[in-house]
Amino acid sequence: MSRLEHRFAQLKTEGRAALVTFITAGDPGYDTSLKVLKGLPAAGADVIELGMPFTDPMADGVAIQLATLRALDAGQTLQKTLQMVSEFRVDDQTTPIVLMGYYNPIHRFGVEAFVAQAKEAGVDGLIIVDLPPEHDAELATPAQASGIDFIRLTTPTTDDARLPRVLERSSGFVYYVSVAGVTGAGSATTEHVTEAIARLRRHTDLPISVGFGIRTPEQAAAIARLADGVVVGSAFVDKIASAESPEHAIDGVLTLCAALAEGVRSARR
């Protein structure tokens, strides 16, 4: 059983959803980002998505685009992102880490080398936002063969005809993008999410995590009553962007994480 499978199974027995947190690797600098990464589990993160900075983050809104630029300006590379995971794993062998980003840096790195180093570092899953199922076998097949889950995105525009193709060979969990658009967009209604999750459950037994637009403990709790996972990203990135110092960035992210975690944990009480 993979770390992701184990974590979602564990939380199912506890009767609650997972808090899935996103930060961009290397934002605002390597050392600060690593401290945030290491602090997230104790603050309540159940699964961590770690963004791989790329020069053309077309699926991301302004907040994450700026986070990517800060990280790249500070010297972050894909190799350093894998190094961050390795350093995280020294003290934490249980919290799943999912790398999220675009295919171009992986292609340039070399798929075989990337998969091997990601596995060695302790990466548990991949979300590659610009690789549709028709074109992802070059990465998905070797990743899954090595034990790294390949997590695909579904959206409000993914109809029943296409959904089986998107879910085919998916593993880890399904990421439902609740709002069509870029990251940080407005949140969907609970009625819409309820209907979407019911439709997804007719097609898959995988855990379903819902993201895009969730920023407050109240919003997190509302989604946690419906989904297996609640994904929060832009709200954390905004805390880093507005911080007056690295210490304030770390404190801001971890304080928000704790509040969101309480919202998720209280949702089904």
Swiss-Prot record:
Enzyme category, top tier: lyase
Catalytic machinery residues: E49, D60
Pfam hit, one: Trp_syntA
Gene3D superfamilies: Aldolase class I
Keyword entries, A-Z: Amino-acid biosynthesis, Aromatic amino acid biosynthesis, Lyase, Tryptophan biosynthesis
EC number: 4.2.1.20
Catalytic function, reaction form: (1S,2R)-1-C-(indol-3-yl)glycerol 3-phosphate + L-serine = D-glyceraldehyde 3-phosphate + L-tryptophan + H2O
GO MF term list: tryptophan synthase activity
The keyword Lyase is annotated on this UniProt entry: yes
PROSITE patterns: TRP_SYNTHASE_ALPHA
Any one of the GO CC terms: cytosol
Pathway(s) per entry: Amino-acid biosynthesis; L-tryptophan biosynthesis; L-tryptophan from chorismate: step 5/5
Family that this chain belongs to: Belongs to the TrpA family.
UniProt subunit comment: Tetramer of two alpha and two beta chains.
Function: The alpha subunit is responsible for the aldol cleavage of indoleglycerol phosphate to indole and glyceraldehyde 3-phosphate.
UniProt name for this protein: Tryptophan synthase alpha chain
Source organism of the structure: Pseudomonas syringae pv. syringae (strain B728a)
